[in-house]
Amino acid sequence: MPTPKAFTLLGPTACGKTALALKIAETLPVEIISLDSALLYTGMDIGTAKPSASERAFVPHHLIDIITPVQTYSAARFVEDCTRLTGEITARGKCPLIVGGTMMYFRALTQGLNDLPEADACLRADLDEQKQMYGLDFLYRTLQKVDPETACRLKPNDSQRIGRALEVYYLTGRPMSAHLNGQPEHTLPFELYTAALIPENRARLHENIALRFHLMLEQGFIGEVENLRRRYPGLTADSPAIRCVGYRQAWEHLDGATDRQTFIEKGIAATRQLAKRQLTWLRKTPLDCVADPFSDGTSGTRLIEAAKRFFGE
């Protein structure tokens, strides 16, 4: 049996990945595998710019709406799901098209996973108690002592990742940085072609981000977050689902911490920061083909042709 093939379309938020993926679907018999951690959650449609019902009816989409906002998902599970789906889609005679910008998942898929321990509920409860008693700054200073490399790359207010780094250290006796630096060799079980939309005009990308954020507000984004708060009482601003850009800022606004204008400004700024991080990842990623989505209108055609050649169509 021939080795399965998958075509990956990467790019920062608001650069036109979904629109291009649908154009590819007009040309090739594809099924889309979402590479977007925000699209996993049910009930989070507007703020994630989730593909519409008609778009999902036009071409099959996978790894969308598979967990609730109070459930968790991991890079390890993505690798497992993506690998399985690639084989299943290929067996159906279709072409797997991986689309998104969650670069941590892509790195896990292409470079492999580190042997980090599973979360430990008892240890995490102990760390949460320490945070309540002594403050997050105490945990951050502890991390600086036991794993200065990880502490250096984390923000002092990143409660979730600080807790996870300490958890790894206490469970294994080794700092997380040592685990990450000791990454084993990894071989993909399928052939992968990696294309990316990378805009040279950063101002145009920022304009798209602002326009899309305002459109989300018109579509009822605040109401969507209010519904999440009512439906899932266990959700907090630190929940992984609410850490998605826009949602945390909306959550703070609904808590009364910001007025509407400040919320909008912070939401747009957070989305721009996400795009910046995605572009930084992309510039370090080996790519088979790169196109500027805001250039002359031919970039989409080039990537469609690249996909056709790759799949032998």
Swiss-Prot record:
User: In UniProt terms, what function does this protein have?
Assistant: Catalyzes the transfer of a dimethylallyl group onto the adenine at position 37 in tRNAs that read codons beginning with uridine, leading to the formation of N6-(dimethylallyl)adenosine (i(6)A).
GO molecular function: any one? ATP binding
Please report which protein family the annotation says this sequence is part of: Belongs to the IPP transferase family.
* The organism's taxonomic lineage, starting at the top: Bacteria, Pseudomonadati, Pseudomonadota, Betaproteobacteria, Neisseriales
Provide the residue positions that the database annotates as binding substrate.
13-18
EC no. given is: 2.5.1.75
Protein name, per record: tRNA dimethylallyltransferase
Q: Which reaction does it catalyse?
A: adenosine(37) in tRNA + dimethylallyl diphosphate = N(6)-dimethylallyladenosine(37) in tRNA + diphosphate
The alphabetical list of record keywords is:
ATP-binding, Magnesium, Nucleotide-binding, Transferase, tRNA processing
Single biological process term from Gene Ontology: tRNA modification
Instruction: Check the record and name the NCBIfam families matching this protein.
Output: miaA
| Gene3D superfamilies in the record | 1.10.20.140, P-loop containing nucleotide triphosphate hydrolases
Cofactors per UniProt? Mg(2+)
Oligomer and partners: Monomer.
Q: Where is this region: Interaction with substrate tRNA?
A: 36-39, 160-164, 243-248
- Spell out the Pfam families in the cross-references: IPPT (PF01715)
Q: Which residues bind ATP?
A: 11-18
Site label Interaction with substrate tRNA, positions? 102, 124
What is the organism field in this record?
Neisseria gonorrhoeae (strain NCCP11945)
